[in-house]
Amino acid sequence: MALPSSSLSSQIHTGATTQCIPHFHGSLNAGTSAGKRRSLYLRWGKDNQAKKLGPSKIVACAGQDPFSVPTLVKREFPPGFWKDHVIESLMPSYKVAPSDEKRIETLITEIKNMFRSMGYGETNPSAYDTAWVARIPAVDGSEKPQFPETLEWILQNQLKDGSWGEEFYFLAYDRILATLACIITLTIWQTGDTQVQKGIEFFKTQAGKIEEEADSHRPSGFEIVFPAMLKEAKALGLALPYELPFIQQIIEKREAKLQRLPSDLLYALPTTLLYSLEGLQEIVDWEKIMKLQSKDGSFLSSPASTAAVFMRTGNKKCLEFLNFVLKKFGNHVPCHYPLDLFERLWAVDTVERLGIDHHFKEEIKDALDYVYSHWDERGIGWARENPVPDIDDTAMGLRILRLHGYNVSSDVLKTFRDENGEFFCFLGQTQRGVTDMLNVNRCSHVAFPGETIIEEAKLCTERYLRNALEDTGAFDKWALKKNIRGEVEYALKYPWHRSMPRLEARSYIENYGPNDVWLGKTMYMMPNISNEKYLELAKLDFNRVQFFHRQELQDIRRWWNSSGFSQLGFTRERVAEIYFSPASFLFEPEFATCRAVYTKTSNFTVILDDLYDAHGTLDNLKLFSESVKRWDLSLVDQMPQDMKICFKGFYNTFNEIAEEGRKRQGRDVLSYIQKVWEVQLEAYTKEAEWSAVRYVPSYDEYIENASVSIALGTVVLISALFTGEILTDDILSKIGRDSRFLYLMGLTGRLVNDTKTYQAERGQGEVASAVQCYMKDHPEISEEEALKHVYTIMDNALDELNREFVNNRDVPDTCRRLVFETARIMQLFYMDGDGLTLSHNMEIKEHVKNCLFQPVA
């Protein structure tokens, strides 16, 4: 059959409107995207009349042969990587042992008890703060300490090297500060001469080496309190190396900082200076400073600072606070207390990132209810009555509370932005830490539409974190973590909309430090945040879930082979990659059926996409669509062999799915499934019409259809029946074709697909994509500008999707997850290109391997 002349044109009739579209020479065989390769050629029926295709008619212009159409060119895809023999070769020997199940249950119980026992915060002793509390003379006037148990603790807890501090961690700054505080206290009470001498020897040895330690390991307020205590030590006659260059440098830093301090700032509003009042005693107006006392009687939750104020003022509330702390800890005090908000938020974040939060839903809700009850629109600190908010706790709280449906505003971040648009941890601070900027960055990805402050925070923190990665000597200001660099790398490469729960869990299992410590005025630990039990459960649970997933994948591979789909030469075989999608986010064992339905439905969207794209004739495709509409297996006899395989597999699979759905929903769902597929096939057909005649629709016309043809809605609407919830018509309408929620999922999936595939598809004859359609509407702009605009549309849609996900509380949680996570998996698959079709040589292959085949050690 001869190709038509390029000077001839055909017409598309849409209602009363007729458009002439030039025909073209050559193949219309299109590119590689998973959901939009609409390069079907027009086929004409035996009645020698133009076939009616959906809403359009294709007729010939004057002089054109209506039967002259291009010849179909066979499409070829890269072969699938995950063949049966490959999967078998990767199957680990791991099996879920009864002892593992028992240990998992034990750990779940123990961690639940940890959550339920959370009060004001569990933490370790601070020798530094305990020394300051031990200084307080008895209020009855006797020449004894008010808290003799704290003095005894100092005498009993000197380390072998003569220092005081945390035995299993050595930071020179921390040890020197604590040791200096302890030897001063012992000297004041004229006791422990041996301990004092050993402490002095340690100080002399380490003070000369301290410059070798990173400045970022210097505790908060060190340059304020350390020189002040040196002055006390000198007055007490302690033989310390006061003339060392390091000591002189610290003294100079203190003087410079105090000179920069406005005289009225200390009393105007609560600042972090309240944390170090013991180092500012010579300049503090004690009457004025009392106006900034916290409700609990402390000064910024610091026992040392509060002890110093009490010794100067005799304030009863200060004494009540110290009694309260010692009642909790016995014979010592921590570096700050309470830590109730910090502990709860970080514990929730820990179990979520490790992928074990599904075991602790009630405990998480209780913890977040507590935090929300103390939420402040100006921000929060580490404790409920802390008057100085910090961006670390605030950003963590904003992100987690928002994702759990609490009403919190991003305006809270304005507290921490300076006049230059930079973000800092504390008001007036000039330094930032990696962990606080990382938490702000993570928070910035759960933006709602129009939240400019979050967008500013995202840009600021991304810039900071990328610079931090380039600085190989960079350390965090607030924490000593096992692998903070790995955490930052993951967050920048896989931000929220690409970070699938199983991948994040695997990454965080590798990066999580069960012995991580934090830096305040001294080094401290939080056992309800950093704990070996979390890690042990995460590893056992990950491997257990992965074992079940491998079994499910083998079942689906058997379904694929027994249905004859491996014989189909025109389609892509991506069973493992497609199964990885639901396994990466709806991973819990109880959703096995939902994962199977999701995977089978997704495989059919790929098969039928490829079938309608370039393989089937219009007569046969019309017959296929009619067979679905009538649900009539008898029509299969009129189909060619490969289409028989497709329809028989389709018919049998969805009959089985419908029967299972009837049992779960308590009503017939077959007609519902049919209707879902009818809409899907109509969208495929419309794009086939456009592609056949090289019609470039307007952007709006394109998106209206393409957000459906991407097929995500079809997958979700059928899979939702198996989420364990009874779905009423009202619930189904909230995630249905007309819902904003489902539309945004399809829109963002379509746009990320198009932005990564349109160039390759255009080179292979494809004419319609979001970029090309937008350029048609705006011929004055360049391709680069059009692409940028499409990215902007997608980013805005993702923000709106966040809001729909968070606020759609009438929809069961699992259904909301299904919609939202399906949108996110598309962002992952298409982050660098067509991750489905080209999965064999893209990072998706490694994700599949890590998620499904490689247990964590």
Swiss-Prot record:
Species assigned in the record: Pinus contorta (Shore pine)
Motif DDXXD motif per UniProt: ranges: 609-613
Listed EC numbers: 4.2.3.32, 4.2.3.18, 4.2.3.132, 5.5.1.12
Reactions the enzyme catalyzes: (2E,6E,10E)-geranylgeranyl diphosphate = (+)-copalyl diphosphate; (+)-copalyl diphosphate = abieta-7,13-diene + diphosphate; (+)-copalyl diphosphate = abieta-8(14),12-diene + diphosphate; (+)-copalyl diphosphate = neoabietadiene + diphosphate
Protein name (Swiss-Prot/TrEMBL): Bifunctional levopimaradiene synthase, chloroplastic
Keywords of the record: Chloroplast, Isomerase, Lyase, Magnesium, Metal-binding, Multifunctional enzyme, Plant defense, Plastid, Transit peptide
Assigned GO CC terms: chloroplast
Cofactor(s), names only, from the UniProt record: Mg(2+)
GO term, biological process aspect, one: defense response
Positions annotated to bind substrate: K257, K477
The keyword Isomerase is annotated on this UniProt entry: yes
Residues binding Mg(2+) 4, per UniProt: D390, D392
